[in-house]
């Protein structure tokens, strides 16, 4: 049995080698010929699964994507061909939410505002948007939700229309898939018309899919230099990056918001376990058993934590400025976008830090945020 995996999928080679012959290749450059005699294909979001790629897939029975997003896969085509498909919904939700919080903490420090006084506008209330809302609840930060599809489906949460969210939010953070059809397409959801309405004190963050934001329109908006700020982890035509847009961004990173080590381990193990079920095999993987010990110290609190403490804890785990600096330095090199993703450092989640303190420290909000807590 031949299993073709993306070479940049952590832990995949060691796990899938238990089930058959593993072939590792670059996910972005896969061709139809690569799928000849392949039984299973394990990918990430850089691989477009379409008719062209599958044209020589004479034995393919299973496709798994170790990502939460699925818009890179033609699911209708797989169903038509009788090929089983699975994804890893929610695998990266923690990493993306922590990325957003890191960006806001640094911007708050740089520009002298408090995120606790801001209203967040979360566009897309799926796995990632919902987890970010959970984090904001833990910190008692106000937010608005926009997701017309979930609202139509009867989701009991309180939603607002996009125009209201754009008007009332200080921070607009995008967590939608990319869709071009249907009643609520997200392609260029944030285009020239929307951008022209945004205030100069607002912040836009896109850690969803690049084409959700019209990058040319965003560039023109930022060229006004009136205080409006934008953070992009994804780009409309990635791996190509508009080098005129880049210096206008507050932070820019190569599609790594959800690239925490825990998230990647979750994604790989989720599709591994699904493939084992498909094969009726008994093997199962637990992401926690794959993770190395985090090189992050335990933290002891001797008094009630405050906003400054929280800022320090968040930056101890992940400081977006590190990735931003590397991105700006390396992006002009040929192939840099994918290389930075391939060589990405072992970033951890809040859960990798154990915070020790007494009951008087009120550690519950930190626990709800994801930190590991020990009361003494």
UniProtKB/Swiss-Prot annotation:
GO biological process per UniProt: pyridoxine biosynthetic process
PROSITE patterns attached to this UniProt entry: D_2_HYDROXYACID_DH_3 (PS00671)
Keywords per UniProt: Cytoplasm, NAD, Oxidoreductase, Pyridoxine biosynthesis
Subunit: Homodimer.
Binding residues for substrate: 45, 67, 259
Catalytic residues of the enzyme: 209, 238, 255 (proton donor)
InterPro entries: D-isomer_2-hydroxyacid_DH, D-isomer_2_OHA_DH_cat_dom, D-isomer_DH_CS, D-isomer_DH_NAD-bd, Erythronate-4-P_DHase, Erythronate-4-P_DHase_dimer, NAD(P)-bd_dom_sf, PdxB_dimer_sf
EC number of the protein: 1.1.1.290
CDD domains to which the protein is assigned, alphabetical: ErythrP_dh
Family membership: Belongs to the D-isomer specific 2-hydroxyacid dehydrogenase family. PdxB subfamily.
General function of this protein: Catalyzes the oxidation of erythronate-4-phosphate to 3-hydroxy-2-oxo-4-phosphonooxybutanoate.
Subcellular location: Cytoplasm
UniProt catalytic activity: 4-phospho-D-erythronate + NAD(+) = (R)-3-hydroxy-2-oxo-4-phosphooxybutanoate + NADH + H(+)
Record-level GO cellular component terms: cytosol
Binding residue positions for NAD(+): 127-128, 147, 176, 233, 258
One Gene Ontology molecular-function label: hydroxypyruvate reductase [NAD(P)H] activity
HAMAP family (UniProt xref): PdxB
Pathway linked to the protein: Cofactor biosynthesis; pyridoxine 5'-phosphate biosynthesis; pyridoxine 5'-phosphate from D-erythrose 4-phosphate: step 2/5
Organism the protein comes from: Aliivibrio fischeri (strain MJ11)
Protein name: Erythronate-4-phosphate dehydrogenase
